[in-house]
Amino acid sequence: MKLKPFAATFLFCAAACLCATAQSAPADNKAVVTAFFRMLFQDKNVDKALQTYVDKNLIQHDPYLPDGASAMADFYGPYLEQHPMATADIKRMIAEDDLVVVHSLWKESPEDTGQAVVDIFRLRDGKIVEHWDVSQDIPENPANRNTMF
């Protein structure tokens, strides 16, 4: 008879631990993506950012890049060398389950009006395994006074 309360308590605690893990995963994923952005776009350490945070078999939905982390290295290495003042300023970040959405201001130089960019990352085991993105040039004469951020 004493086993039933013990079993119930054990199951409750196990369920609580699983829920806590599931709830902390989005925060962990946000931390991974934040560190990835910092290392790639602020530190300009392309190889280390990709080795640390991106799965080598990355599924890429950007129509200009093939799949794989090496394709990102082939693009961002030379690009950031040619544009050493390029920045990605994160304006907001949203995480749910295994997805992280980043809304950022991308500028090639301080004088650039920039682009509003939305990146969506899917993570597994602390690595980015899938990526989508869309971007829009920021107009010089917008139809309203609201910013894109």
Question: Where does each model-flagged region fall?
Answer:
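Positively charged n-region of N-terminal signal peptides that target proteins for export
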Residues: 1-5
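Bacterial N-terminal signal peptides
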Residues: 8-17
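Boundary at the C-terminal end of the N-terminal hydrophobic targeting segment
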Residues: 19-27
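Short acidic-aromatic low-complexity motifs
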Residues: 27, 31-56
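A solvent-exposed, acidic/Ser-Thr-rich amphipathic alpha-helical stretch
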Residues: 46-96, 111
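Short beta-strand segments that buttress and anchor functional surface loops
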Residues: 102-109
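A short, surface-exposed beta-strand/turn
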Residues: 117-128
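Low-complexity, intrinsically disordered terminal/linker segments enriched in charged
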Residues: 134-149
